[in-house]
Structure formats: structure tokens, C-alpha cells
Amino acid sequence: ELDDIGKDEL
Amino acid sequence: MNIFRFLGDISHLSAIIILLLKIWKSRSCAGISGKSQLLFAIVFTTRYLDLFTNFISFYNTSMKVVYVASSYATVWMIYSKFKATYDGNHDTFRVEFLIVPTAILSFLVNHDFTPLEILWTFSIYLESVAILPQLFMVSKTGEAETITSHYLFALGIYRTLYLFNWIWRYQFEEFFDLIAIVAGLVQTVLYCDFFYLYITKVLKGKKLSLPA
């Protein structure tokens, strides 16, 4: 979900 | 990826390199807070545990490896290689007052109650206050070497650029992560005082001196 996308940030 | 995030990562990377080179070249960590560097090593360790399990891109993986390796190298230089030059008397911020509250908060406020997610959340909260021992040390010594102020400026600007990255991602990717945004705002606000001094003093060729 949305939050998983965030984990592409350093 | 967008320009703000890319510039933010470059700024973060250059801050880390500036610090590494400053200590290595001058063979001294005078004016550098070992406690802040320890906190950064904890931040990267707890945030990048998925380094080997979750491949996102070559860029992402290589930057994570560089961040973790350089933070440990910096801690090693401060507490081992050049420990004779470590100014422990001025590096007295009580880091337990940063680690304990952020650890508790990461259990209370997170996106998912799983070990990886709680550790990631802890690393986000801790990063937002990790610079405090360094800023405290600069205010205690009353001044900072120019190279150290460039390091701090690059480090502060990185998260400021990330704030613009989150505005961009909200606008164009319908994405936002409130935990990262709030922590990023706190982190940037902590630098405001320093940004003001940096722009009004260091950019005019003067030495950075804080009212002690």
C-alpha cells in the first residue's frame, strides 16, 4: 500500500 | 525520483564525505560531536536493515552501503583512530534523552507494528534529533571550524530538500508519509538557528560563532 512506496527513499 | 530528492541525497552524501575528509586529512576530530555520529550510525543501521532483503535499485542499494560504511568509519575515526583529538569535555549532550523517547514513540506511533517498521520509524524519529549533540557542542565551544559549518549546512539542507520532495510526491504521486514529514519538519526547524548564522556569517567569510 501507500506506505511501502515510501521505503524507496533513503 | 525527483530533483528535490536527488539534490537532497547529493547534499547528504557530500556532508558525509566532507566530514570524513575533514577528519582524515586534518587527522583530527576537534569540534566534532562523536555522540551525533554514533546516533547517525544507529539511524542508518536501523533504517537499512532491509538492505539485503529488499532490492529497490542499484542507486538505492549503493547509497545505503555508502551511508552505513561511512558512518561507521567516522565513528571509528572519532573513538579509535583519532580519539586523542576527540573533545569529550564539550561533547556532553545526554543522548539517552534522545534515544529513549524516540524508541518509545516509535512503538506508539508507527504505520505497522512489525519489527522492521518499528525500527524504521525509530530511525526516522532519531534522525530528526541526532544533530542536537553537535549543535549543543558548537554552542558550548562558542564556535565551529568553517569546514564543520559547511558539513552542518549540507546536512541540514538535505532534509529541507526532502520536504520539497514530499510536496512533489504528494502533488504528482498521491504519496505522503506523515511520520517522515513531521520528523523532517522537526529536523529542519532545529537547523534554522544555524542556517541563519551560516548565511549571515560564514558566507561572508567570517567564522561561525554562536552566542555561548
Swiss-Prot record, chain B:
One Gene Ontology biological process: protein transport
Positions of the record's site feature: Interaction with the K-D-E-L motif on target proteins: 5, 117
Topological domain ranges for the Lumenal compartment: 1-4, 53-58, 111-116, 169-178
UniProt keyword annotations, A-Z: Cytoplasmic vesicle, Endoplasmic reticulum, ER-Golgi transport, Golgi apparatus, Membrane, Protein transport, Receptor, Transmembrane, Transmembrane helix, Transport
Subcellular location: Golgi apparatus membrane; Cytoplasmic vesicle, COPI-coated vesicle membrane; Endoplasmic reticulum membrane; Endoplasmic reticulum-Golgi intermediate compartment membrane
A Pfam family recorded for this sequence: ER_lumen_recept
PROSITE patterns in UniProt: ER_LUMEN_RECEPTOR_1, ER_LUMEN_RECEPTOR_2
Domain of life: Eukaryota
Single GO MF descriptor: KDEL sequence binding
Membrane topology: Multi-pass membrane protein
This protein's GO CC annotations: cis-Golgi network; COPI-coated vesicle membrane; endoplasmic reticulum; endoplasmic reticulum membrane; endoplasmic reticulum-Golgi intermediate compartment membrane; Golgi membrane
Record carries keyword Transmembrane: yes
Ranges annotated as spanning the membrane: 5-24, 33-52, 59-79, 93-110, 117-135, 150-168, 179-199
Site note Important for recycling of cargo proteins with the sequence motif K-D-E-L from the Golgi to the endoplasmic reticulum, residues: 193
Role description: Receptor for the C-terminal sequence motif K-D-E-L that is present on endoplasmic reticulum resident proteins and that mediates their recycling from the Golgi back to the endoplasmic reticulum.
Name this polypeptide is given: ER lumen protein-retaining receptor 1-B
The species this protein was found in: Xenopus laevis
Gene: kdelr1-b
